């Protein structure tokens, strides 16, 4: 087997360059504060089954590439979701539904975010409606159904599924739990990012 560094398809110099190495970390906290992240941790760490996930050192790969360390955060077993986005959507569901009568939550997704929203709704006994494009695999749709979500397949791509989610949610007074922001829709994506930050 060839090593990665000998494989001509890898653009080695571009691969290891990090154009954002000197980014201003304080800019992150101007959008999402440490207090908000700490609040997410306080809630999520009290969920049944919560535990830290491992940070793996990919020694062989870092050695082959001549990089001191490459770390991989293994989120695959978090709450049995098999998703790297396990925390964000579920946290947003909990925060948005707090102190409200029984609500229905909705989202558009290609899979991972929807799985988190579906699981978050299931653990709180809420109805969940998920909109996916025609290109999302049936395995992903089934994974969301397994957490109690009703899944709607929409003709077209992700953008089409998001438009349909917004349309149906407005019509039926469902709470949209989306991981992207738009004008006058920033709170839920911010809560989702706070959940991701717990990773």
Task: List where the protein language model places each region.
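PLP-dependent amino-acid enzyme catalytic core
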Residues: 1-199
């Amino acid at each position: 087997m060839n090593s990665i560094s000998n494989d001509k398809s890898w653009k080695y110099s571009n691969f290891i360059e990090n154009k954002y190495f000197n980014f201003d970390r304080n800019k992150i906290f101007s959008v999402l504060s440490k207090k908000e992240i700490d609040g997410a941790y306080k809630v999520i760490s009290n969920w049944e089954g919560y535990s830290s996930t491992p940070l793996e050192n990919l020694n062989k790969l870092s050695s082959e590439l001549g990089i001191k360390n490459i770390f991989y955060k293994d989120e695959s077993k978090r709450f049995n979701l098999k998703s790297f986005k396990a925390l964000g959507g579920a946290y947003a569901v909990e925060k948005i539904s707090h102190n409200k009568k029984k609500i229905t939550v909705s989202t558009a997704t290609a899979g991972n975010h929807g799985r988190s929203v579906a699981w978050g709704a299931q653990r709180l006994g809420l109805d969940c409606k998920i909109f996916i494009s025609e290109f999302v695999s049936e395995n992903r749709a089934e994974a969301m159904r397994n957490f109690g979500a009703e899944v709607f397949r929409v003709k077209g791509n992700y953008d089409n599924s998001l438009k349909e989610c917004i349309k149906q949610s407005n019509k039926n007074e469902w709470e949209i739990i989306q991981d992207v922001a738009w004008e006058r829709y920033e709170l839920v994506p911010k809560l989702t990012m706070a959940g991701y930050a717990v990773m």
